[in-house]
């Protein structure tokens, strides 16, 4: 028969409270079925366990009890036998309550608690084994087997759990623990046979080592023997300390020093070095050099003094020479050593510029200082430096360094500052090694300037920054290499021939030039500050996402375009067409307010002269000019234009190239007049990152003069003269294939001319492009048939609807007519219209990834006019549609296909000037 209990009653005793807490956790205890039997069961059990029963306790009336088991004979049976029999009534407990030894507890009054019976099986979700009478049960054997199984379980867990070795920080030894859980339950582990004695608790500083992990390496102990290493002195500190050597007490530097120098020490493990002891001694000037450097010196079997002697023999611009030249110089002076290792050492210690203070010279003349720093035991004892070192200090003064670490000094030695380069006055070529250096390499001297780094690239050449050897003023040199390519050489000569004649305050000046007949052309010019108009438009973004108001965008476009118009009018007055007008070729210099911004036209590689009677001249000159002597007429044209266009009054003497001039422009942005223009060494720096306009690649060279520089340079006014006065610039007309500078800016007549030259017509040498109409081909044929009727005394010319000009000499009706170039002022005006549109809208008017399609769009003049109208008519309702209307009409007039209807420069200037005046008036009214 089985009996069980559910819950002990709460009677306030500690034991009953413990029982109640156990019940709340879901654990039950075995007991009988009724309160009456509970009292009887507790009384008999106390007697069975040898507990004395009070005499005054009344006996229970079993007649009124419902129990079916009578325990008194069992007590008598136990008393009669020495050991319990197999029929013993036992109390089996679960492991959840290992401390339960009885089914009832004694209350403080000495009685037993009334216990409630458990519910029948099925009504309770959790039961334990209650008091049970099991016949033939050997309880002792059962308990022993249970204990043995528990021990086996713990042994299995200990073998499967990684053993953790814990270091006792107090005792310095290691102890084994079975698991992290065992660490927290230290008392329980003491009962296990596999644990070791440990009475100390863990601390956060204790280190843990898992022996069963893949890494069985013990922690690396910290070294006990270490040497003190000091940081090297800076140049300023070394120079300050070296000044104390002239005092009366040369053996005690710190006695005369009022400053306390803090020692920076670091403890590092002692490492063996293959360097001889002489290098590690305090007397050596290299006693705190990097170990790798000392090892290199040891491997090369060269002493520091020998290294200094070698450096003295090298040219002062050794690091600026090409690699092949440096190699030859090293082999010449040190043939028995590895030139690569020697070059590495020289790079580390040769420079004494502001970018590097870690040099042999600095260590040689501060040997006593380094000794004082390295010696910690005798800091007040110093050695007197020798006289030779003192002399070297006076000849090679140290400079303050901005870089403190050895690593940064070593890296900076590979890229010396341009200040030190500009101060080098010696010949860059020395000895037999000089023949291998190219004349355009970094560090070379050209036109009185020292070449610096490359800051731009072009179609055939590069742009290098340069510095005046005498003054240090920064400029740029355009280097175009031809090396036997006669076509490129002719192209460069043509550019210089035109550029040297252009002297205008809105044209980038050619300060000096030099021709190397077998190598390259060098063109010296100023350096402009703030990028190009292309950079400015990129900063504005497209009109839909414009970062500035439309009103300001239109005013700035007009203001900058009027300056460009001044340069174009001057060039056209000299019968010169630019041929490559675009945003990238308009340099921008920002000075203070926006009203002080200046535009400079550059890149004359596509420029050429055009005939005065050119049909594409677009009425650049006065119509009443006679067709007499060409030379006299050209001279009178310049005089006429100077009177007609007072804004182009800057024409200095050819003997000087004074880039500074006063200007009295009619158009202003906010102020009515400009201040005298004095460029301040034009240094370029574009602060914003660029994103390129989506346009096809062009065949022209990009702008090369707007790269950044370090600082503004002083004004340069000394005249320059070309180095080749006898250079023949005749017969340098551009090749027909080079008429198109940038395809998105090309005019329709240039494209048709290019298509006609690519064709192979037997009669006219004119075949139109695949996208041209048959009417254009017929018009070209009819135009050529009319050539025979022209006068024999003049050179006949005709213009077809397709924009192709044909001419034929007199009396040569049987000869094939040649095609006259359409490149003229009208082409520059078309490109100007493309520029205006791009500045206003923020994108090119003609743009397509497929080049044939782009050509077709340009020929038919198809572009987005609605976007242009949105920008130009930004406040049409408020101002009755007058503001921006002239700017819109100007762009449309410039982008007109019909040459007769395409606007002229004079009309463009008048309309834009009126727009500017009206905009300023409205701006002043709004401000007031």
Curated annotation (Swiss-Prot):
One GO cellular component, as annotated: cytoplasm
An example Gene Ontology molecular-function term: protein kinase activity
Binding locations of ATP: 455-463, 478
EC number: 2.7.11.1
Keywords: ATP-binding, Cytoplasm, Kinase, Nucleotide-binding, Phosphoprotein, Serine/threonine-protein kinase, Transferase
Claim: Transmembrane helix is one of the keywords in the record: no
InterPro entries found in the cross-reference section: CDPK_Ser/Thr_kinases, Kinase-like_dom_sf, Nnk1, Prot_kinase_dom, Protein_kinase_ATP_BS, Ser/Thr_kinase_AS
Cysteine disulfide links: none
Residue stretches in coiled coil: none
Bias type Low complexity, positions: 13-29, 375-391, 769-813
Residues bearing the modification Phosphotyrosine: 739
Record bears the keyword GTP-binding: no
Phosphoserine, modified sites: 178-179, 405, 426, 737
Catalyzed chemical reaction(s): L-seryl-[protein] + ATP = O-phospho-L-seryl-[protein] + ADP + H(+); L-threonyl-[protein] + ATP = O-phospho-L-threonyl-[protein] + ADP + H(+)
Principal location class: cytoplasm
Domain Protein kinase: 449-912
Source taxon at top rank: Eukaryota
Subunit structure: Interacts with URE2 and GDH2. Also interacts with the TORC1 kinase complex.
Function: Serine/threonine-protein kinase involved in the phosphorylation of the NAD(+)-dependent glutamate dehydrogenase GDH2. When overexpressed, confers hypersensitivity to rapamycin and induces rapid nuclear accumulation of GLN3 to activate the transcription of nitrogen-regulated genes.
The name this protein goes by in its record: Nitrogen network kinase 1
Organism: Saccharomyces cerevisiae (strain ATCC 204508 / S288c)
């Amino acid at each position: 028969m089985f009996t069980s209990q559910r819950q002990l009653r709460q009677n306030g005793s500690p034991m009953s409270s413990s029982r109640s807490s156990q019940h709340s956790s879901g654990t039950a205890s075995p007991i009988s079925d009724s309160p009456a039997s509970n009292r009887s069961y507790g009384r008999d059990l106390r007697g069975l366990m040898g507990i004395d029963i009070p005499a005054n306790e009344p006996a229970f009336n079993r007649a009124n009890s419902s129990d079916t088991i009578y325990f008194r004979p069992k007590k008598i049976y136990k008393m009669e036998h020495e050991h319990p029999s197999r029929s013993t009534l036992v109390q089996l407990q679960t492991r959840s309550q290992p401390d339960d030894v009885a089914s009832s507890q004694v209350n403080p009054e000495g009685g037993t608690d009334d216990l409630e019976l458990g519910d029948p099986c099925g009504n309770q979700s959790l039961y334990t084994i209650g008091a049970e009478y099991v016949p033939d049960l050997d309880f002792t054997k059962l308990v022993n087997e249970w204990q043995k199984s528990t021990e086996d379980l713990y042994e299995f867990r200990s073998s499967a759990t990684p053993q953790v070795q814990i270091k006792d920080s107090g005792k310095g030894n290691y102890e084994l623990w079975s698991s992290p859980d065992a660490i927290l339950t230290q008392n329980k582990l003491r009962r296990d046979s596999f644990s070791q004695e440990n009475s100390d608790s863990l601390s956060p500083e204790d280190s843990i080592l898992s022996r069963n992990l893949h890494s069985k390496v013990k922690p690396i102990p910290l070294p006990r023997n270490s040497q003190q290493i000091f940081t090297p002195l800076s140049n300023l500190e070394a120079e300050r300390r070296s000044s104390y050597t002239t005092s009366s007490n040369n053996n005690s530097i710190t006695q005369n020093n009022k400053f306390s120098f803090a020692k920076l020490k670091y403890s590092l493990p002692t490492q063996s070095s293959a360097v001889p002891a002489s290098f590690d001694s305090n007397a050596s000037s290299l006693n705190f050099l990097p170990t790798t450097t000392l090892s290199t010196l040891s491997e090369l079997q060269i002493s520091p003094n020998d290294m200094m002697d070698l450096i003295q023999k090298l040219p002062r611009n050794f690091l600026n020479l090409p690699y092949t030249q440096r190699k030859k110089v090293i082999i010449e002076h040190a043939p028995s050593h590895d030139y690569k290792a020697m070059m590495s050492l020289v790079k580390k210690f040769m420079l004494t510029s502001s970018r590097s203070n870690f040099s042999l010279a600095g260590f040689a003349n501060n040997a006593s200082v380094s000794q004082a720093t390295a010696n910690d035991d005798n800091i007040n004892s110093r050695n007197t430096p020798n006289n030779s070192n003192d002399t070297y200090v006076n000849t090679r003064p140290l400079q303050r360094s901005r870089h403190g670490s050895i690593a940064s000094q070593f890296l900076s030695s590979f890229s010396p500052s341009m200040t030190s380069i500009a101060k080098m006055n010696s010949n860059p070529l020395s000895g037999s090694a000089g023949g291998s250096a190219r004349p355009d390499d970094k560090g070379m001297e050209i036109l009185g300037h020292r070449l610096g780094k490359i800051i731009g690239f072009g179609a055939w050449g590069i742009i290098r920054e340069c510095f005046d050897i005498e003054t240090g003023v920064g400029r740029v040199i355009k280097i175009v290499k031809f090396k036997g390519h006669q076509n490129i050489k002719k192209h460069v000569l043509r550019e210089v021939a035109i550029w040297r004649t252009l002297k205008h305050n809105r044209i980038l000046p050619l300060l000096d030039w030099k021709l190397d007949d077998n190598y390259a052309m060098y063109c010296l010019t100023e350096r402009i500050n703030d990028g190009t108009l292309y950079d400015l438009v990129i900063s504005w973004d497209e009109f839909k996402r414009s970062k500035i108001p439309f009103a300001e965008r239109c005013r700035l476009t007009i203001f900058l375009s009027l300056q460009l118009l001044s340069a174009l009018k001057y060039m056209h007055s000299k019968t010169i067409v630019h041929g490559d007008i675009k945003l990238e070729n308009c340099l921008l210099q920002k000075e203070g307010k926006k009203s002080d911004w200046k535009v400079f036209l550059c890149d004359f590689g596509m420029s050429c002269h055009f005939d005065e009677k050119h049909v594409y001249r677009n009425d650049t000159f006065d119509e009443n000019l006679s067709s007499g002597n060409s030379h006299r007429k050209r001279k009178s044209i310049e005089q006429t234009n100077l009177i007609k266009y007072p804004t182009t009054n800057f024409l200095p003497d050819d003997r000087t190239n004074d880039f500074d001039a006063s200007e009295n422009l009619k158009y202003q942005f906010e102020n009515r007049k400009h201040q005298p223009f004095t460029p301040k060494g034009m240094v370029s720096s574009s602060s914003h990152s660029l994103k390129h306009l989506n346009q096809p690649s062009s065949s022209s060279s990009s702008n090369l003069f707007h790269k950044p520089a370090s600082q503004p340079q002083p004004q340069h006014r000394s005249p320059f003269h070309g180095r080749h006065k006898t250079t023949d610039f005749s017969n340098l007309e551009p090749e027909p294939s080079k008429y198109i500078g940038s395809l998105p800016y090309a005019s329709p007549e240039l494209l048709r001319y290019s298509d006609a030259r690519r064709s192979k017509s037997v009669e006219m040498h004119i075949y139109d492009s695949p996208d041209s109409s048959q009417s254009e081909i017929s018009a070209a044929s009819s135009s050529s048939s009319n050539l025979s009727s022209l006068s024999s005394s003049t050179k006949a010319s005709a213009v077809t609807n397709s924009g192709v000009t044909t001419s034929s000499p007199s009396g040569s009706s049987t000869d094939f007519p040649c095609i006259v170039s359409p490149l003229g002022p009208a082409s520059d005006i078309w490109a100007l219209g493309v520029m205006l549109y791009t500045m206003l809208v923020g994108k090119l008017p003609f743009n397509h990834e497929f080049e044939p399609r782009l050509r077709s769009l340009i020929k038919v003049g198809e572009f987005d006019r609605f976007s242009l109208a949105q920008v130009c008519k930004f406040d049409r309702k408020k101002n009755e549609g007058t503001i921006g209307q002239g700017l819109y009409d100007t762009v449309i007039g410039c982008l007109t296909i019909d040459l007769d209807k395409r606007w002229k420069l004079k009309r463009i200037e008048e309309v834009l000037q009126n727009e500017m005046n009206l905009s300023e008036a409205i701006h002043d009214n709004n401000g007031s």
